[in-house]
């Protein structure tokens, strides 16, 4: 069964959101990037991504651990996924991306998300 393991949120004020989630939910900063900060509660990853001209505030991507991509691919298509599975670059946490019927990005990781 696929499991939600990652969520990325675009923010016009990354520092404010990092402070909110680390204070209110006691999440830990697990690593930083020039344009994002990654938090974890030990089971779930949350990335706060800087807003830019291409990204609007709000949901950027929802990430799932998946066990069987072949079965899931058929389920995604039957449920109305708005795109086919797209392979992701090797340095990406997920192996594939697909979009739900509303166009939201879904990242699929076969190897599992690195949760610290």
Segments from the language model and where they lie:
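Short secondary-structure junctions
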Residues: 25-32, 81-87
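N-terminal beta-strand motif that seeds the catalytic metal site of vicinal oxygen chelate
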Residues: 1-15, 45, 59-62, 112-116
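Vicinal oxygen chelate
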Residues: 4-11, 53-116
């Amino acid at each position: 069964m696929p499991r939600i393991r990652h969520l990325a949120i675009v923010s016009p004020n990354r520092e404010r959101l990092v402070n909110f989630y680390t204070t209110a939910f006691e999440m830990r900063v697990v690593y930083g990037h020039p344009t994002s900060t990654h938090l974890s509660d030990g089971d779930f990853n949350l990335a706060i991504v800087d807003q830019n001209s291409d990204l609007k505030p709000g949901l950027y991507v929802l990430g799932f651990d998946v066990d069987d991509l072949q079965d899931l691919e058929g389920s995604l298509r039957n449920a109305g996924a708005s795109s086919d599975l797209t392979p992701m670059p090797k340095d990406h946490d997920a192996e594939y991306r697909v979009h739900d019927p509303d166009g939201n990005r879904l990242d699929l990781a076969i190897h599992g998300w690195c949760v610290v």
